[in-house]
Amino acid sequence: MTQVKKWSVLPVILLLCSCDEGQKVKPYTGQSAHWQQSAVPISLQCAACHTKEFEDWAGSDHAWAYRTVNPELDSEPFHGQRLQAHGSELRFTTAREGHLLLADSESKRNFTVHSVLGRRPLVQYLVQGKDGGLHTPSAAWDVTRRGWFDMFEADERLSREGSATRNAGDWGHWQGRGMNWNSQCAWCHTSHFLKNYDATADRYNSGWKEPGVTCIQCHKLSAAPSADGCLVAPGERTLSAQQMHDNCATCHARREELDDSFVVGDKFDDHFRLELPIIPGIFWPNGMQRDEDYCETGLRLSRMGRAGVTCLDCHDPHTATLKLPQEDNSLCMRCHATGTVVGSTASPVIDPATHTPCPTGSKGARCVECHMPESPYMARDPRRDHSFNSPDPELSAETGVPNACLNCHKDKDHAWAAGVVAQKYPAQKAARYRARTRAVHHALAGEGNTQELLAALAAEDVPGWRATLLELLARQEQTEEIQQAARAAMKDENAMVRAAAARALGEEALPLIHDPVKIVRRAAAWQNIRHLVNSPQAADALAELTAIARHQSDQPTGAMLLAMLADAQGNTAEAEQQYKRAISLDPASAVAYMDYAVFLARRNRPMDALQQMLNCTRVAPQNPEGFYRLGLILAELQQYGYALSALDKALQLSPTFHRARYNKAMLLQHLGRHQEAQKEMELLRALQTPPTPTQP
């Protein structure tokens, strides 16, 4: 048996063998008795036979994803340094007993540092929260610059929201639920993690089998060692490329977690819902990352993902580094030099010397600089985009999508870059790509046009984009054309497309509650929740929906889902309690106030509903839906002047807001202002989408 070179991996061995406080008091309960009683960490048992793989892994970022505090590694950042962040001063010191301390002037508390995330280019230190979970302060240690910094120092989200800080009590404040490690980080920084949240006590009792992303996160354990001594059952040792990719995607994706029971070999879509470009500010309308979006969405939206390219085509599974260098384009040329067939598609043959207008050997001549530009995560961690778009300066000027040309040519503008692109690639910009980007851009800006979206859908063959366009169509005023497109999509082979179709179809999607994939069943179930409550045949669907909501109940979205379930089941008191709980978890959530207001309005409590809608418009003054709903409630209260003002504000924020214009026209008609009402209806007809009235 080959021996592991312990001196080369000693730090990782020590990390595996150390048993942190979280594991002592919160034992992992999801493992078989054999592994729970094992005295030697499983990954070290793997190393006995798989020496090379273990040593490769020991030097990877996966191995260092989570660990306990180590005085030798962590003393430098805790020598009295100070950092001003979000109205508070943070001070980092070391106690006499050797504990690392974080002092927060805002809460006037000293926190003992519990554990550590990552190792480069930044390190995050976790502290214990009041809810039994761990929290990630907004301060992180820059390994290269050797200093503390605020991870939100250049956060576009804060500027979009009109705020410069994350205040105490906010969901996104570091002591809030948005920065709770157990809910937001732990699945991807430990192996075999279980959240174990107790909603009644509002406390976490989480557990994990091993710190970091270890062997057992990517290789499925057998119930006991096999006859050959291997810890992985013979039938589980060979996985398909898609199964391995789905395992990577559980962490390298911006996604909604439906449960924490994923094991290697499962489908991603049975446990997670992938985030698509359907919410403003999250992705650019061409699918490029705008926020911290990770890799999976971009890849699923790309032609390469459509062809069958997966993570392991480019990345080594154990070192987690690239298989070939990117600097000389050898990684990309591995396929694009000879037209390698991936799946059933031949890669386009590319000659780097003639393909780019940039000089050979320059930074701009690297494939990744144009097709995978970097964006900063946590302010100082540059990560590459995986949507594999081509620079289109014309679209950049029109829609704001990133223009990679200007990353190097900072003294130039979009017009200059557009001229270069037009000269070099006179006929290579696909009309379909531009039409789709414009359609998504208009929809995200609240100016969606049904015909534009339908045309883009009809021309699209990438499943991720088909799902995106259907999701955006589901938010439009429904027409027979939309319904026909959604009915056809119900039979699509891709689960994301079927789930999007369910959201557009409503009651017609009821048969999809029996779909083999969870994201589809879940989408169809929410559209038919009242049917589920009253149908014994739908008991399984209702139980699954309830389990998802309970799993997410530590977050405001989960509380709102529980509220809707309780409401559908006629439990008004429970529903109201959950709406209030959602607001307490995120006092700045416009959606929570809005949904609560709708709930109250339907129970003939218009004054209470009015107060919640005023709260909604206060926290989200740029949200047209909020002012629209406010206008409906004011009209119900016969405050017609104020109602018109609210509807006007909604239309000012979104001139193509069909429902707002329709209801304004109806209100003007009610007030006897017929010419003004007729003018509004003419404007509405010009939008070419017949409206339907909406009640609050």
Describe each PLM feature range.
Residues G22-A33, L44, K52-G118, L122-K130, ...:
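Primarily the internal scaffold of c-type cytochrome electron-transfer domains
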